[in-house]
Regions:
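Conserved short alpha-helical segments that host acidic/polar catalytic motifs at enzyme active sites
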Residues: 2-229
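A short, hydrophobic C-terminal helix/tail in secreted or cell-surface proteins
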Residues: 230-235
Length: 235
């Protein structure tokens, strides 16, 4: 499953105007178990938002509660994914990400989605945007013993969601509680083994769209990723 990309943007072509970095795409299919392929095409449509790294995490809502699988790497979507590794990502709920680094170095460790195993289970997170208080939140967590594996804002968010989930009745409540601590412009998708949750900053600076086709729901940074799937869109 590869695409010929004959024309690439030259490094000399610099966009000096307002633009977005990173793209997120999530999908929940109530009927099938091949959602990774759908997310692959969604990320391909969002490739212009990030060319450094990409990844897809999937879960089977009918499987074990800690069954989130992830595949990610450096490069374009068609370079990181093949038919073989997509075939291994079986499930009906998924979140994907394409990255253009604005915080944190361009390394595989910083590729998303991030997947965390914590006291109450497992979660995956894909994030677009920046936090102005990321360093402050990171230092607070480190003082309590948290050990970070990346240098990106997204891991700070994931830690706070996991921390709030321990004392929250639902994953949705945990995301809302974590958001109260975040300052900045962001949109994010959080996936538990059973749920797909979308959120953005209170001012809506970073886009997040929702769509539906048949029994599949979608969350994404841009409606361009809906076009190739012929989805109805809602903003």
């Amino acid at each position: 499953m590869a695409f010929d990309m004959e024309e690439q943007f030259s490094e000399e072509c610099v966009d000096s105007g307002i633009h977005e970095e990173c793209g997120v795409f999530g999908a929940y299919d109530f009927d099938g178990n091949d959602i990774a392929s759908t997310v692959y095409y969604g990320l391909f449509a969002l490739q212009h938002r990030g060319q450094e790294s990409c990844g897809i995490a999937v879960s089977d809502t009918n499987g074990p509660k800690k069954n989130i699988q992830v595949h990610k790497g450096m490069g374009l979507v068609n370079e990181v994914f093949s038919s073989e590794n997509l075939e291994k990502l079986k499930g009906n709920i998924s979140v994907g990400h394409v990255r253009y680094s604005t915080a944190g170095s361009s390394t595989r460790e910083n590729a998303q989605p991030l997947v965390l195993n914590y006291y109450k289970g497992t979660l995956a997170l894909a994030h677009n945007g920046n936090l102005v208080n990321a360093l402050e939140l990171r230092e607070e967590l480190e003082k309590t013993g948290a050990i970070f594996q990346t240098t990106i804002d997204s891991e700070v968010i994931a830690y706070h969601v996991a921390k709030e989930r321990i004392s929250s009745a639902t994953a949705e409540e945990a995301v809302l509680a974590a958001m109260r601590k975040l300052k900045g412009a962001y949109s994010l998708i959080v996936m538990s083994p059973r749920k797909l949750i979308g959120a953005r900053d209170p001012f809506g600076f970073r886009p997040l769209c929702i769509g539906k086709r048949d029994n599949t729901y979608f969350l994404t940074s841009e409606t361009v990723s809906y076009t190739h799937l012929t989805l109805p869109t809602k903003l």
